[in-house]
Amino acid sequence: MLAKPRPLDHIGDADDGVAAKAAGLDALYGHLKPLEIIERSARELFHDEIAAVSSFGADSAVLLHMIAEIDRTLPVIFLDTGKHFEETLGYRDALVADFGLTNIQVIKPEEAALARIDPTGNLHQSNTDACCDVRKVEPLARGVAPFRAWFTGRKRFQASTRAALPVFEAVGARIRINPLAHWTTSDQADYMRAHALRENPLVAYGYLSIGCFPCTQPVQPGEDARSGRWAGHAKTECGIHLSGLEVSLTDASL
C-alpha cells in the first residue's frame, strides 16, 4: 500500500523551478521500488501527462513489463530513426504483443530535415552528433512535447557517465523519471528470469546496448554495456539524455 501522496505542486515553490521539483520528488520517492515509482508517477503525480520512451533495446523489457502492470494504455514513444536493426523492430512488435501495450507512438525524423541534412543517409560516417540530432534528439523533442514527464529505462550500471543518475531529473520544463536507476545487473537478470521476459535477440551476440546499426557493435569482455556504442568516437550518449534535448525543446518553443 502506497503512503498518502503529496501533491506535486507542494514540492518546491513555483519560483524554485522544475529542477527543484525534480530534486524534491527524488528525495521523497527516489528510494521506492521501481513499480511503486511508476505507479505513483502515473496515477498521482502526472496522471495523463506522462509517457515512456523506449528503444526496445537490450534492457527495455523490464520497464515495459512494469508499465503494462500499471497501465497498458500509457503512451510509449519509440524513435524510428530509419537505422534500426531489423531484430530491434521485430523485438518491438513482439514485446508490444506480449505485454498488451495499446498506445505505441512511433516518431520519425522529419523528411525535410533528412533531405537537407542527411540526403545520402551516410551522415553517421562523418558527423555522428549531427546524425543523432536529426534522427533522435529533434524527433524525441516532438514526441515528449505533449507531456510533463516521461519514464526511461536508464540505469547507473550501464556506463560511468550514468553513475550518479537520479530517479527524478529536470529536462527544461519537464521531468524525466528513471525508475530503475539504482538497479544492478543482477536485479535486471533476476526480474527477466522471474517473469520469463524475452530478450532482444541481439543480446545473444554480445550487443549489450543497442542503438542504430551503423554505430553499434558487440561489447568485449570487461567493457561496460555502452562501450559498443559509437566505438572509436569520443561519444557515449546520442544526445537525448544530455542537454541537446533541452536545447531542442527550447528551440521548438515547447
UniProtKB/Swiss-Prot annotation:
One of its GO terms (biological process) is sulfate assimilation, phosphoadenylyl sulfate reduction by phosphoadenylyl-sulfate reductase (thioredoxin). Its EC number is 1.8.4.10. Its cofactor is [4Fe-4S] cluster. GO terms for molecular function: 4 iron, 4 sulfur cluster binding; adenylyl-sulfate reductase (thioredoxin) activity; metal ion binding; phosphoadenylyl-sulfate reductase (thioredoxin) activity. Gene3D superfamilies: HUPs. It catalyses: [thioredoxin]-disulfide + sulfite + AMP + 2 H(+) = adenosine 5'-phosphosulfate + [thioredoxin]-dithiol. It comes from the Bacteria. NCBIfam families: cysH, PRK02090.1. HAMAP family: CysH (MF_00063). Belongs to the PAPS reductase family. CysH subfamily. Catalyzes the formation of sulfite from adenosine 5'-phosphosulfate (APS) using thioredoxin as an electron donor. This is Adenosine 5'-phosphosulfate reductase. It comes from Mesorhizobium japonicum (strain LMG 29417 / CECT 9101 / MAFF 303099). The lineage of its organism: Bacteria, Pseudomonadati, Pseudomonadota, Alphaproteobacteria, Hyphomicrobiales. The gene is cysH.
